């Protein structure tokens, strides 16, 4: 409840800085939290925060949970951003990645020998751990994945990629000390997609986002140091600012994100 109150107050403060006749982006079923990059985007684009989806106005399905139910989505217009992105569970990410990339992230923990990753199915649970397989049983509500070797000079290196309207706008290279595999990012460095991914890999990542129906959001990507292969391990339709991103980088990062987001507003003549 407190987070929803904070989101409502943040929206009111944002709207107070704009004229009442400024265009509106309707968020449903939730309003964004104050730390969400979407605030930097809509501030640059002069959009108010609305909470009453209606035809003729842009809307975005905004739910921080893992699934969006048909009941939650019912008030949204048929052309709402992220309307079809109703499942960002870890197993959905795994299935979609294997279908698009042609090689799996998921493993069978009952037959896999050696180290593997176990983590909760639900989004933003942050309960990942490294186990030694094979296991005797699966844990309900958990998924099991290969341990991607992303150690670079003693640092765990992960990548995050922002997408909007099929465009890969900006990436981050994130570092944290071993053995903090699942949290504790110390440094996030903005990169261009070209600096981190080949043209073929960028095409693969765009196809993954399309298969997830992720019109706007972010993907967490790992690169295996032994094979060079990339793996998408998480998809998020309500991104937050990555820890470790220096304030001096905010302006350039959010300028790029706002420019990419314009593509999603073209149907309403707001690009």
Regions found by a protein language model. Name each.
Residues 77-79, 133-136, 249-251:
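Glycine-rich, phosphate-binding/catalytic loops in enzymes
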Residues 111, 163-164, 223:
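Generic beta-strand structural signal
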Residues 129-212:
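Phosphate-binding site of ATP-dependent enzymes
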Residues 4-124:
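Conserved N-proximal alpha/beta basic substrate-recognition cap immediately N-terminal to
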Residues 68-70, 90-91, 124-128, 170-172, ...:
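Short catalytic/ligand-binding loop motif for oxyanion handling, primarily in non-cytosolic enzymes
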């Amino acid at each position: 409840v407190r987070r929803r109150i904070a989101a409502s107050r943040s929206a009111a403060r944002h709207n107070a800085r704009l004229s009442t006749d400024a265009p509106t982006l309707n968020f449903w079923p939730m309003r964004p939290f104050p730390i969400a990059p979407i605030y930097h985007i809509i501030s640059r684009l002069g959009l108010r925060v609305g909470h009453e989806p209606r035809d003729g106005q842009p809307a975005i399905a905004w739910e921080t949970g893992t699934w969006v139910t048909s009941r939650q989505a019912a008030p949204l217009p048929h052309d709402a951003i992220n309307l079809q992105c109703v499942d960002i569970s870890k197993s959905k990410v795994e299935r979609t990645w294997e279908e698009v990339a042609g090689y799996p992230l998921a493993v069978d923990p009952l037959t896999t020998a050696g180290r593997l990753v176990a983590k909760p199915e639900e989004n933003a649970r942050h309960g990942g751990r490294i186990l030694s397989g094979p296991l005797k049983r699966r844990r309900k509500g958990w998924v099991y994945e290969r341990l991607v070797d992303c150690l670079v000079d003693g640092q765990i290196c992960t990548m995050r990629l922002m997408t909007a309207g099929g465009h890969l706008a900006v990436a981050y290279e994130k570092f944290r000390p071993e053995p903090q595999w699942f949290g504790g990012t110390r440094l996030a460095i903005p990169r261009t997609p070209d600096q981190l991914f080949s043209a073929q890999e960028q095409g693969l990542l765009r196809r993954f986002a399309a298969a997830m129906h992720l019109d706007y959001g972010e993907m967490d990507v790992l690169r295996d140091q032994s094979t060079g292969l990339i793996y998408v391990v998480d998809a998020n339709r309500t991104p937050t600012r990555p820890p470790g991103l220096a304030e001096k980088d905010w302006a350039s990062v959010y300028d790029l994100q706002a420019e990419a987001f314009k593509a999603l507003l073209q149907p309403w003549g707001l690009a």
